[in-house]
Structures are given as C-alpha cells and as structure tokens.
Amino acid sequence: MNNMELVHADNLTPDQLMEGDLIKINDDIVEVVNIDSDATGSIYAVEHQNEFGEIEIAEYNFDDLIPLYVFIEEDEE
C-alpha cells in the first residue's frame, strides 16, 4: 500500500505560484485558488482555501518567498 506524505519542496516568489499549489501560511497548508498582482507587479494578492473550505486573501511583495509543499508517495513495506 502507498502512503502520501506532505513535504516542503521549495520556496517560491508569488509570480512562480500556480493555482492548485499547496503553500504554507501561518502554520497552515492551504491551496492557491487565484493569484493577482497590482499594476506595477510589486504586490501580489494570493487567494487561498484552507482545509475547511474557507477562502482568504494573503498579500505578498514580489520578492517574498512562500513555502511550497507537495505530496510524495511512500511505499509501505
């Protein structure tokens, strides 16, 4: 049987994020729903959904680093 483990994969700037990415915000792992930037591209609004389905928006500067998480499969012996 295979187990899925959530692991830290990388730190990304807001412009590297994609919808569906799993990121860490305030000790919670959330899913990116939408990403928008201001006219200058210096401030990004990242709309995200938590495990309870609640949607919130977090703002980041263009050079902030955001922890990206991914699921990996582990074979159980």
Kindly give the residue locations of the regions a language model identified:
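Intrinsically disordered, low-complexity, charged/polar segments
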Residues: 55-77
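Generic cytosolic/nucleocytoplasmic N-terminal low-complexity/intrinsically disordered segments
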Residues: 1-2, 23, 49
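Generic preference for hydrophobic/aromatic residues in regular secondary structure cores
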Residues: 9, 18, 41, 63-70
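Residue-level marker for the onset of beta-strands and adjacent loop->beta junctions
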Residues: 18-19, 56
